[in-house]
Amino acid sequence: MNSFLKDVRYALRQLTRAPGFAATVIVTLALGIGANTAIFTIFDQVLLRMMPVQNAKELVRFEWIGGFSGSMSSFGGDSQNLHNYFSYPMYKDLRDKNTVFSGMVAAVRGGVGVSWHDQAENKDAEIVSGNYFNMLGLHPALGRLFTETDNTAKNANPVVVLAYDYWKTHFNAAPDVVGKTLLINGHPFTIVGVGPEGFHSAIDRYAPGVFLPISMTDIAMPWTASRDDLNNHQSLWLTLIARLKPGVTREQAEASLGPLWYSLRAEELKG
């Protein structure tokens, strides 16, 4: 076990030094049940610190290296690889049962078809939990941003927030755009707001065209509808970002959250 952990820590250190990778500060916690070993990590990424959001230094991301067995629907490869992704039920459990974070959000990128008047194009969409903008301490340039009420029911909230740059370049910064309708993958969505100037994304260095509520995943990513991602414990697809409570360190957060994550994941795989 000790040798394995040393090898893993060395590999993680090498990854952070590799060209093209964002520098990270990584703390690891190893947990074992029988022959299975899983390592859950909470890390502070340079990309997070550079975001124009409230108290960016408090933001952390999660990853894990798995020794679990079981079926997974993951963007991240097989269960032996380093994962950035978590299921939606896992996200809700970690968000609601932790004692070390003041907030936690979930997000994923996906390509969508956007139609506005006589223009149609494919754009990146950032599909986010309802508390995404509020947890980051962001305010709209126009209209409103998402709230938890936009995640109340599956496929029941066809609303969209335009990214600031997309609003300027494709909508000519029209001040009356709020309340208008555009089509996402052929479905009508109401524009409720424009994102803040200068903010791109919490999970990618490149800005999306639009932000969509996670409750609309089946329409935003129709190829996933058969997986029922919002209820499927085996579908790993979301990046999670959390804000540390004042005075809580990454080490303390990991020591608290790691065992919770491990027990939840073990239960998921019992199925």
Segment roles from a protein language model:
Residues 31-35, 39, 245:
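Hydrophobic alpha-helical membrane-associated segments
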Residues 10, 36-178, 183-190, 198, ...:
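Structured, solvent-exposed hinge/loop segments at the ends of secondary-structure elements
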Residues 1-29:
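N-terminal Sec/SRP start-transfer signal
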